[in-house]
Amino acid sequence: MSTYTRPVMLLLCGLLLLTLAIAVLNTLVPLWLAQANLPTWQVGMVSSSYFTGNLVGTLFTGYLIKRIGFNRSYYLASLIFAAGCVGLGVMVGFWSWMSWRFIAGIGCAMIWVVVESALMCSGTSHNRGRLLAAYMMAYYMGTFLGQLLVSKVSGELLHVLPWVTGMILAGILPLLFTRIVNQQTQARHSSSISAMLKLRQARLGVNGCIISGIVLGSLYGLMPLYLKHQGMANASIGFWMAVLVSAGILGQWPMGRLADKFGRLLVLRVQVFVVILGSIAMLTQAAMAPALFILGAAGFTLYPVAMAWACEKVEHHQLVAMNQALLLSYTVGSLLGPSFAAMLMQNYSDNLLFIMIASVSFIYLLMLLRNAGQTPNPVAHI
């Protein structure tokens, strides 16, 4: 049977449209808040509110999928995300935008859980890696195109919200023409998120997802603000964010092939080390293009390698629970990263954004080095 079946392709098409909308909002919301003269710590709190919504959405989507299936869960998630988008135009203010971004965060997390779980459950041990790679490519391509849109269109709030909302609703259309069936067989014992988080053999993968959340959450939430403080216009900010994300797209397949050949432990070490180098290079402000490129290539590919590490440690019937656990870990990191980095930037210097990213990456590198002789070195299937 073909890996890229009709339901899979339609699902990825819908994801591409939704990710476009997510990328546009994640870039422009911090800028809209800055234009409203909100302090940096409040900008960070709004970003954290979005990731708090991710946390909540991740927790209950597995139960929702079991009750109403993949298709209806996907429709509901998209409508919740659209509501969070429309709400931004109703009231402009710190507390109202915290609420709407929280709602949008719930919808986005539900979308990710539904899409990832559907791909994992429709695949086998022979093609699940290719499905995951296709998922990451679609996700990052949507993010890249979203950044380009920001650099080409008007960034005014009331100009952006109508077409972004339309794009979210258009993301529902592909799944109206297919039905995604859960081919996963019923397990004798249901798996829980907490059980997945406690697996010792998957701990490096879980920790990697947390670190990835800190790194990417901080970059998504605060990099536009950092660039704004450097005196850049919205179009330039969109361009540099596109450079960051395009590096992540280009790095997906090479990192997967390297992990397949040399093992995930070595690849994770190299990725984390390159994130540290990219952060240090950003502090020098001498060559932002190569610095952003290597930061994106390493930072954006950390999550799938860490995720593949953990998923290889569980049985087929545990994949949805493990997927939820990894998304939960990523979301916790995404919640903590922008909040802490925003406080550092507000009270001290914008450069502390990259110092924090380098510091947490160094801690994870120490974990990888310390566990070298204790943890098996699984080979990737991406």
Curated annotation (Swiss-Prot):
It is found in: Cell inner membrane. Gene3D superfamilies: MFS general substrate transporter like domains. The chain crosses the membrane at residues 8-28, 45-65, 75-95, 102-122, 131-151, 157-177, 204-224, 231-251, 270-290, 291-311, 325-345, 349-369. The keyword Transmembrane applies. It comes from the Bacteria. CDD domains: MFS_YcaD_like. GO terms for molecular function: transmembrane transporter activity. It is a multi-pass membrane protein. GO terms for cellular component: plasma membrane. NCBIfam families: PRK03633.1. This is Uncharacterized MFS-type transporter YcaD. It comes from Salmonella enteritidis PT4 (strain P125109).
